[in-house]
Design a protein with these regions (language model features):
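Stable alpha-helical elements in mature extracytoplasmic
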Residues: 176, 245, 252, 261-265
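Single conserved hydrophobic/aromatic residue that forms the stacking wall/gate
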Residues: 2-13, 277-278
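Extended, loop-rich substrate-binding clefts of extracytoplasmic carbohydrate-active enzymes
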Residues: 14-45
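Secondary-structure capping and boundary motifs in well-ordered enzyme cores
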Residues: 195-196, 236-245, 258
């Protein structure tokens, strides 16, 4: 699930991070970019509910390489199983099951690229090194559909949320930005300075990042007992709650701002209880 830019095979093993400056970063709801000057790459990210979209613009004349590294771990994680494989001239699929914050964390992905790979090498079963012909200066766009259920659902998420856009990164970004504007327009602020209003809406944006949607576009999701279930149409299954410190203010605020979200969260928590008889 981690796409890391690298100059070649040697960096796959060294895993040396690329230097960057925070002054070269840009961030807004649904968008992030960083200019990796040392590597000669502009990396941009946007998203839909189940798909991550990458755009990499390489400086002309350098080797255009992407590393898909499913071996990458946080300090407290352990990989039970995982793999990456090529399933088309411009497509990769893969999965990983780990133990870390919780046990048995599944993630499946289908990644489609805006042009075929010039070459692909696999240093390990969970890594892929891709090269592209970018001599024309045309960027590489990558769409990554994810699911915690299976590969088929990851593909379905990818198709339903991005097929109508093709590989038009800017169009997806604009649609995502419009969705965020609707989310943030639930409160209208008057008065104060521009900096204070920016601070307020940034905090409101942060309040809407979690919990995460755990169900796929077909309604399927993986329960806490590892079985797969399907929710009724129109409802979302959520995960990644932090109720120990959100019950004081965040939850009361959501009962005022987003009752649909609150209802879905309550149903999600009840489902966790029913699947484990434990919260």
């Amino acid at each position: 699930r981690d796409l890391v830019r690298s100059r070649g095979l040697g960096d796959v093993y060294k895993r040396q991070p690329l230097a960057f400056s925070h002054s070269d970063e840009k961030a807004s709801p649904g968008y992030y970019s960083v200019n990796l000057r040392e590597a000669g790459v502009l990396a941009e990210l946007t998203t839909t509910p189940h798909v991550g979209i990458h755009r990499y613009t390489y400086k002309k004349g350098i080797e255009s390489t992407l590393v898909v590294d499913m071996d990458h771990l946080l300090d407290n994680e352990y990989i039970y199983e995982g793999w990456v494989k090529q399933t088309g001239e411009n497509e990769l699929t893969g999965m990983r099951r780990t133990r870390g914050w919780v046990d048995n964390q599944y993630v499946f992905f289908v990644a489609q690229f805006s042009q075929p790979f010039s070459s692909m090498e696999q240093p390990s079963e969970r890594q892929a090194v891709l090269t592209f012909d970018t001599t024309t200066g045309k960027p590489i766009v990558c769409k990554v559909g994810v699911s915690i259920v299976n590969e088929e659902n990851a593909r379905l998420n990818l198709e339903q949320e991005t097929d109508s856009y093709g590989f038009d990164f800017d169009a997806i970004h604009q649609a995502t930005r419009s969705n965020w504007e609707k989310e943030l327009d639930v409160i209208t602020v008057e008065g104060g300075t521009e900096a204070e209003r920016t601070n307020f809406y940034t905090a409101l944006y942060h309040s809407k990042i979690i919990p995460n949607i755990a169900s796929d576009v077909n309604g399927q999701y993986r329960r806490h007992d590892m079985s797969v279930a399907t929710i009724p149409a129109g409802r979302r299954q959520f995960s990644t709650f932090s109720t120990w410190d959100t019950f004081r203010a965040w939850h009361p605020m959501m009962t005022l701002l987003d009752t649909t979200l609150v209802n879905d969260m309550v149903q999600s928590l009840l489902d966790m209880y029913l699947s484990l008889i434990h919260i």
